Amino acid sequence: MNLNTKYHGSIEYEEKDVIYFQKGIPGFEELKKFIIFPVEDNEVFLVFHSIENKDIGIIVTSPFNIEKDYEIQLEEEQITNLKIQDEKDALVLNTVTLDSDIDKITVNLRAPIIINIKEKIGEQIIINSDKYKVKHPLFKEEA
């Protein structure tokens, strides 16, 4: 199949690449089907893109690129909804807010996207803790 995206051109994907979000994601609850593909010439960022709306693509990254000790505790309901039986089956991604000023690029560590890579289902959750910020700087100033 082919997805003609607004910013990333034409992307080839297969049905097995589609990840289903029963609740959609906050702000885009009506969109349920997404694919993930790499940003060209970049090993850190991925594109989390709706296949139902060619204009909706979100830059994401692994939280472990930002915080080596990043950890979250899923609630039983979330584990059940995502059918996670082993933590190796869970992919964790976080949304990135881009800015032309590199020092203003942030990552939302408070609301990770959790994907069961075996079952191809996902959910964006909100962590009820002040441990992580919604606007965590991607690049920290060196002391």
Swiss-Prot record:
Domain of life: Bacteria
InterPro entries, per the entry: Flagellar_assembly_factor_FliW, Flagellar_assmbl_FliW_dom_sf
Annotated Gene Ontology cellular component terms: cytoplasm
Subcellular location field: Cytoplasm
GO BP, sorted A to Z: bacterial-type flagellum assembly; regulation of translation
Keywords in alphabetical order: Bacterial flagellum biogenesis, Chaperone, Cytoplasm, Translation regulation
One Pfam family this sequence matches: FliW
Alphabetical list of Gene3D superfamilies matching this protein: BH3618-like
Family in the record: Belongs to the FliW family.
Oligomeric form and interacting partners: Interacts with translational regulator CsrA and flagellin(s).
PANTHER family: FLAGELLAR ASSEMBLY FACTOR FLIW (PTHR39190:SF1)
Function description: Acts as an anti-CsrA protein, binds CsrA and prevents it from repressing translation of its target genes, one of which is flagellin. Binds to flagellin and participates in the assembly of the flagellum.
NCBIfam families: PRK13285.1-1 (NF009793)
Protein's name in the database: Flagellar assembly factor FliW
Provenance organism: Clostridium botulinum (strain Loch Maree / Type A3)
